[in-house]
Amino acid sequence: MEHLVNIFVKSIFIENLALAFFLGMCTYLAVSKKVQTSMGLGVAVIVVMTITVPVNNLLYNYFLREGALAWAGFGDTDLTFVGLISYIGVIAAIVQILEMTLDKYVPSLYNALGIFLPLITVNCAILGASLFMVERDYNFVESVTFGFGSGVGWALAIVLLAGIREKMKYSDVPEGLDGLGITFIVVGLMSFGFLSFSGIQM
């Protein structure tokens, strides 16, 4: 249990996909103008990551990795070379289901997210979580924990940035830094803040 808590906490604070690995930056910068929209996207990312990472874990362990198809009589088969396209396919399918669900039941959030909801499909943070899961050889329970924690970490980062950007509307930002310029500086400072957690031994 302690091991799972370690994975969860590390994925939020120490190995934050947005602020430690700078994954998912396109959506992160584009949708972080309002806290409400950021929270909606953050919840969507949490849901997608919590589902896709363990599903891709099952896909990898029972179909793709070397010897995984021994149950089907193909023990020597190694399908890891199709891993990337397989993970993207799983992510695309789950995002499509989420998109249809939001369109039907929460149309206001669906309209607020706009084009950025389908863009979750190619959000490198989502794909990166699955690739980290494979690289670290997590089992199913660990992958659920890691997927949920990574989603929470990314959502926390985008909501924090949105809150800061809302406050900055009333700040006297130099003309050359207005817009994305000051946002990049803020993201860098936030990254330094999260870097302080790396000193925690877990």
Curated annotation (Swiss-Prot):
Top-tier EC class: translocase
Q: Would the keyword NAD turn up in this protein's UniProt record?
A: yes
Which GO terms of the cellular component aspect does the record hold?
Gram-negative-bacterium-type cell wall; plasma membrane
Kindly state which keywords UniProt assigns to this record, in alphabetical order. Cell inner membrane, Cell membrane, Ion transport, Membrane, NAD, Sodium, Sodium transport, Translocase, Transmembrane, Transmembrane helix, Transport, Ubiquinone
Does this UniProt record's set of keywords contain Membrane? Answer: yes
The membrane topology term of the UniProt record is: Multi-pass membrane protein
* Membrane-spanning segments: 11-31, 39-59, 79-99, 114-134, 144-164, 180-200
Which EC number applies? Answer: 7.2.1.1
- A family per Pfam: Rnf-Nqr
Picking any one GO molecular function of the record gives:
oxidoreductase activity, acting on NAD(P)H, quinone or similar compound as acceptor
Catalyzed reactions per annotation = a ubiquinone + n Na(+)(in) + NADH + H(+) = a ubiquinol + n Na(+)(out) + NAD(+)
InterPro entries assigned = NqrDE/RnfAE (IPR003667), NqrDE/RnfAE_oxidrdctase (IPR050133), NqrE (IPR010967)
Assembly, in brief, is: Composed of six subunits; NqrA, NqrB, NqrC, NqrD, NqrE and NqrF.
Task: Identify its protein family.
Answer: Belongs to the NqrDE/RnfAE family.
Its annotated function is as follows: NQR complex catalyzes the reduction of ubiquinone-1 to ubiquinol by two successive reactions, coupled with the transport of Na(+) ions from the cytoplasm to the periplasm. NqrA to NqrE are probably involved in the second step, the conversion of ubisemiquinone to ubiquinol.
Q: What is this protein called?
A: Na(+)-translocating NADH-quinone reductase subunit E
Query: What species is given as this protein's source?
Result: Maridesulfovibrio salexigens (strain ATCC 14822 / DSM 2638 / NCIMB 8403 / VKM B-1763) (Desulfovibrio salexigens)
